[in-house]
């Protein structure tokens, strides 16, 4: 799954109230460790605190790429969102 698809999932989850910023921060930490090269958004999200929901959303919106609509729909459905 690409980063943009995951970012869209987290954006929708945070704005719907079913995902909190701490979950996104933990994901960003994992991405930094596994990515061949870290990107600015990864470091920025990772350095946010759990109460900086809007800041996390802003950085998620900077993730480049194209979201895969099929994967995104499956993720959202699994979380009870559509």
What are these regions (language model features)?
Residues 1-82:
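Acidic, Ser/Pro/Thr-rich low-complexity regulatory regions
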């Amino acid at each position: 799954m690409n980063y943009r698809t995951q970012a869209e999932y987290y954006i929708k989850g945070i704005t719907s109230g079913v995902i909190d910023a701490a979950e996104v921060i933990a994901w960003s930490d994992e991405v930094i460790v596994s990515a061949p090269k870290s990107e600015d958004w990864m470091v920025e999200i990772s350095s946010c605190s759990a109460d900086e929901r809007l800041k996390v959303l802003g950085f998620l919106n900077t993730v480049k790429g194209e979201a895969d609509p099929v994967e995104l729909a499956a993720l959202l459905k699994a979380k009870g969102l559509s």
